[in-house]
Regions:
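A glycosyltransferase accessory/donor-loop signature
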Residues: 2, 10-123
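Substrate-binding/active-site groove segments that recognize
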Residues: 6
């Protein structure tokens, strides 16, 4: 489970369980990924109830994304082409997009046209 996007009420019991698991994970000395490991333990081992959102709520496969020119938005590459809610620039391979806000992505549109688009939200 990727925790790039998640939400909890401030008084949710999940926070205390997650903090307990995070303290345990940090004792191992490896900081990177500890938050994610702790959340996975919280959900799958401690069996805290959650609602897992679909991938279009936290999309991180940029090379598989499509663009709907008629709606001017990124969409899933497969039917029914849900609108992508959040594009998660996770991992070193996306550093060029994370550090250069003007970097354009070559993306295939639903009309099978290659177009250049900014991966970032632009009003």
């Amino acid at each position: 489970m990727n925790i790039g996007v998640f939400c909890l009420e401030n008084d949710s019991p999940h926070w205390l369980v997650w903090q307990k698991n995070l303290r345990q994970a940090l004792k191992k000395g490896r900081i990177f990924g500890s938050e994610q490991i702790a959340m996975n333990i919280t959900v799958y081992c401690d069996q805290m109830k959650v609602q897992i959102l679909p991938t279009y709520c936290n999309w991180f496969l940029i090379e598989n994304i499509k663009f709907d020119e008629s709606k001017n938005t990124y969409v899933e590459p497969y039917l029914p082409h849900h609108k992508i809610g959040i594009i998660h620039l996770a991992g070193k391979k996306y550093d060029e997009y994370r550090f250069n806000k003007n970097k354009l992505l070559d993306v295939m549109s639903l009309n099978n046209n290659w177009i250049k688009k900014n991966i970032r939200f632009v009003k």
